A protein has these predicted regions:
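Residues at the starts of beta-strands that form the adenosine-phosphate
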Residues: 16, 39, 47-48, 119, ...
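Conserved SAM-binding loop
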Residues: 51, 89, 122
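A short, aliphatic-rich alpha-helical micro-motif
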Residues: 11-12, 43, 85, 107
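Class I SAM-dependent methyltransferase SAM/SAH-binding core
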Residues: 23-79
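Conserved alpha-helix/loop element of class I SAM-dependent methyltransferases that forms part
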Residues: 1-15, 32-38
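A short beta-strand submotif of the Rossmann-like class I SAM-dependent methyltransferase core
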Residues: 19, 90-96
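A short acidic, Gly/Pro-enriched loop at the edge of an enzyme's catalytic core
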Residues: 81-91
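S-adenosyl-L-methionine-dependent methyltransferase catalytic module, highlighting the catalytic core
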Residues: 30, 54, 65, 101-209
């Protein structure tokens, strides 16, 4: 398993980056106070950083309280209407596509915004994490109220391939914000047996030639 944020920051170093869902709504203010908001940490790594989020209130908060520039309010599914083609070296979509009504529309639009040799980094909760399998044995299912989709390593890879990408790498990762016992059990099991039983999956892909 990998450290999600360390991997993203490393892959964005010295690059022109577009961060989708940059405000981490509704946890924006809390993460800023803790120093854990990914967008603020990416500012130290990327050569140029842009952010896109639908929450105007949190965008304004980052602009006013942290003097963050290059922030755009908009819909990720309309991304190709918001930025010019080939504008970015890296697009980061962390815990985003499971919230969308049409993740394929977003991924196809994002592909056109990548520069030659550009990459997209997508992270998602793992739909087949160990704890979810345990709950299913008792007839229960863990579903976040804002999630429209769940992904596994295979289905995330297949979606990226079907949207015109080729895989660079894919890993399991621990959810740092997951403090509840079930998530800890998933990550413990993953560390002992298989990383694909852990709480999250992160993939890097590039447009297929």
């Amino acid at each position: 398993m990998v450290d999600r944020e360390e991997l993203i920051i490393e892959k964005c170093a010295g690059k022109k980056v577009l961060h989708i869902g940059c405000c981490a709504t509704p946890a924006c203010k809390e993460e800023c106070e803790k120093g854990t908001l990914l967008h603020l940490n990416l500012l130290k790594s990327a050569s140029e950083l842009w952010g896109l989020d639908m929450c105007r209130e949190d965008i304004t908060f980052l602009q006013d309280q942290y003097q963050v520039e290059n922030l755009v309010v908009g819909d990720a599914e309309l991304i190709d209407q918001l930025f010019p083609p080939g504008a970015f070296d890296v697009i980061v979509a962390g815990e985003l596509i499971e919230h969308l009504g049409n993740p394929g529309l977003f991924l196809v639009g994002a592909r056109g915004l990548l520069a030659p040799e550009g990459t997209i980094i997508v992270s998602v909760p793992n739909g087949i994490a160990f704890r979810r399998g345990l709950k299913s044995l008792s007839g229960r299912e863990t579903v976040h109220p804002d999630h429209n989709f769940y992904f596994s390593r295979k289905t995330l890879s297949q979606m990226l391939l079907s949207c015109g990408y080729e895989m660079v790498d894919i890993h399991g990762f621990r959810m740092k914000r997951s403090e509840f016992f079930g998530a800890w059990i998933s990550d413990l099991f993953a560390s002992m047996f298989s990383q694909w039983a852990c709480e999250g999956i992160i993939a890097t892909a590039r447009p297929s030639s």
